[in-house]
From Swiss-Prot:
Catalysed reactions, as listed in the record: 1-(2-carboxyphenylamino)-1-deoxy-D-ribulose 5-phosphate + H(+) = (1S,2R)-1-C-(indol-3-yl)glycerol 3-phosphate + CO2 + H2O
GO molecular function: indole-3-glycerol-phosphate synthase activity; phosphoribosylanthranilate isomerase activity
SUPFAM superfamilies named in the record: Ribulose-phoshate binding barrel
Pathway membership: Amino-acid biosynthesis; L-tryptophan biosynthesis; L-tryptophan from chorismate: step 4/5
GO process annotations (BP): L-tryptophan biosynthetic process
Keyword terms, alphabetized: Amino-acid biosynthesis, Aromatic amino acid biosynthesis, Decarboxylase, Lyase, Tryptophan biosynthesis
One Pfam family cited in the UniProt record for this chain: IGPS
Catalytic class of the enzyme: lyase
UniProt feature coiled coil, ranges: none
Listed HAMAP family: IGPS_B
Family the entry assigns: Belongs to the TrpC family.
Official protein name in the record: Indole-3-glycerol phosphate synthase 1
Matches recorded under NCBIfam families: PRK00278.1-2 (NF001370), PRK00278.1-6 (NF001373), PRK00278.2-4 (NF001377)
Organism of provenance: Ralstonia nicotianae (strain ATCC BAA-1114 / GMI1000)
């Protein structure tokens, strides 16, 4: 595990402990379960939205709403989540990914609420999930999917978090970087496997990470390539290998209009 990831996970444990004191687990769980049947906040079907795009022969883009990152600093000083989400929806995104980590990515729960309310797209809570509390919290905020990072979790906890998400009607995107992590991810039932092309130890990025893992990927999984998709040639390279789902953030966040950049990149 990288030093930065260890640091983030330590902070997450502290955040969860503090959140539990502010609002106990039964309260969060009750809100999450109530939201499941709410006409506005009920789950929108994240995995199905990706399948629909791919089935129509198009790239399935998970468009990220991200103000900053630890490695790149502030990406978008004029950060308006609702406006960004609306632009993504207008220009063909399949889903949203919204950063809710405050300390390292300058995200916030309100950004998830605002982005999701601004359009009809399903939304991923992009954060470092280490506790069941966060899963209930995600659904209480309206999240349709959570991220599980294999390198951050032991197998038992990862399975427990996945089961909780599915019980609440959410999908799960499980993230890997190498063959060992993929083997662990495939023990879960989720069809969504994200391959992070960025090495969290060195921060080097190569699309060969996704391409190298494809031969080990079962046909029933949807591969989501993450990080390093910066130009149309990157998209063509992935689609030529039958990778049709993409999580893109930085390229969009640095553009004047994120949705227009999405349309250009995936034209």
């Amino acid at each position: 595990m990288s030093d930065i990831l260890q640091k983030i996970l330590a902070v997450k444990a502290e955040e969860v402990a503090a959140a539990r004191k502010h609002r106990d687990l039964p309260s969060v769980r009750a809100e999450a379960e109530a939201n499941r049947h709410d006409s506005t906040l009920g789950p929108r079907g994240f995995a199905q939205a990706l399948r629909d795009k791919i089935g129509a022969g198009r790239a399935a883009v998970i468009a990220e709403v991200k103000k900053a990152s630890p490695s790149k600093g502030v990406l978008r000083p004029d950060f308006k989540p609702a406006e960004i989400a609306g632009s993504y929806a207008e220009h063909g995104a399949a889903c949203l990914s919204v950063l809710t980590d405050e300390q390292f990515f300058q995200g916030h729960a309100d950004y998830l609420r605002e982005a999701r309310a601004a359009c009809a797209l399903p939304a991923l809570r992009k954060d470092f999930m280490v506790d069941l509390y966060q899963v209930y919290e995600a659904r209480s905020w309206g999240a349709d999917c959570i991220l599980l990072i294999v390198s951050a979790l032991d197998q038992g906890l990862m399975a427990e978090l996945e089961a909780c998400a599915h019980e609440l009607g959410m999908d799960v995107l499980v993230e890997v970087h190498d063959g060992h992590e993929l083997e662990r991810a495939l023990r879960l039932s989720t069809p969504l496997v994200g391959v992070n092309n960025r090495n969290l130890r060195t921060f080097e990025t190569t699309l060969d990470t996704t391409l190298g893992l494809l031969k080990h990927m079962p046909d029933d999984r949807i591969v989501v390539t993450e990080s390093g998709i910066l130009k149309p040639d990157d998209v063509r390279k992935m689609r030529a290998a039958d990778v049709n789902a993409f999580l893109v953030g930085e390229a969009f966040m640095r553009a004047d209009d994120p949705g227009t950049e999405l349309a250009r990149l995936f034209a």
